[in-house]
Amino acid sequence: MTQDTLRFAANLSMLYTELPFMQRFAAAAKDGFKGVEFLFPYAFEAQEIAAQLKQHGLQQVLFNTPAGGADTAGMNAAWDAGMRGTASVVGCENEFQAGVLRALAYAQVLDCPRIHVMAGLLPEGVSADDARPAAQATYIANLHWAAAQAAKVGIDVVIEPINQRDVPRFFLNRQDHAHAIVQAVGAANLKVQMDLYHCQVVEGDVAMKLRQYLPTGRVGHIQVAGVPQRHEPDVGELNYPYLFSAIQEAGYGGWIGCEYRPARGAVTGGTSDGLGWLRRMATGDWA
């Protein structure tokens, strides 16, 4: 198996973290990546990032809407404050809309074709069963609005099931739930971001999930990491050569984001040293 039909993007929030953010673009390009993704760009001017993309021949393939906040300061502080999106959070509709509009403005400058809208957390002190109906209604209404705004500028919106081991109380956890939401909203530019790490942690049966959902055309982005420690794809319990073959066989033509923590950590060369799996794919040695 080779990577001829698979396109891998470096996640610059998790890879090359020994370097300042703006130096990670050059490092990714040097290692052969053609695409990049990251969590949030909002601490930097969009034009600064666009210049790095152009200089190093990289395509921006994905980033997140803000984790919260209604202004620049709030958006930049939201993640560290424990926020994980506002799409399903009752009463945060104005905050949600401000974040989506900010993300779309950045996406247009970066020529990025999709943005990830994080679902958010279920409220504390309320049982999940009691909180879910209102969260679901809020989520669907917000995604209707976000997809309509994004469609005006030719951008896709993706939603990602995330496991509750890593993010307790996260609203969206399962692939079937995400696809049901996409169908309920009914917008052509709303799709699922399928993170195989989260899928394995929550429900397993990853290859069958790929074969079930990729042919629908509703998977807009894939991400990979080893399980259980979220290191390189060749570290852990998942058989990624088999899964990459399944992705190829399903005819998936989108990007695969490398959203993992290098096993060597944030040390000089740590990311590059861990890319043996990608180099082996390029030469067909990882069968």
Locations of the language-model features?
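Histidine-acidic metal/acid-base catalytic patches
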Residues: 1-32, 42, 54-57, 102, ...
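Conserved beta-strand positions in the central sheet of alpha/beta enzyme cores
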Residues: 37, 61-64, 116, 158, ...
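Short coil-to-beta-strand
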Residues: 56-74, 106-119
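Active-site acidic/histidine proton-transfer and metal-coordination neighborhood
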Residues: 80-191, 201, 285
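Short, basic, glycine/proline-bearing loop/turn elements
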Residues: 32-35, 89
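Glycine-rich, proline-tolerant flexible connector loops at the mouths of alpha/beta enzymes
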Residues: 37-56, 64, 119-123, 127, ...
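Alpha/beta catalytic barrel-like cores
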Residues: 24, 38-41, 84-85, 92
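N-terminal small/glycine-rich loop or linker at the start of catalytic domains
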Residues: 2-13, 64-86, 119-127
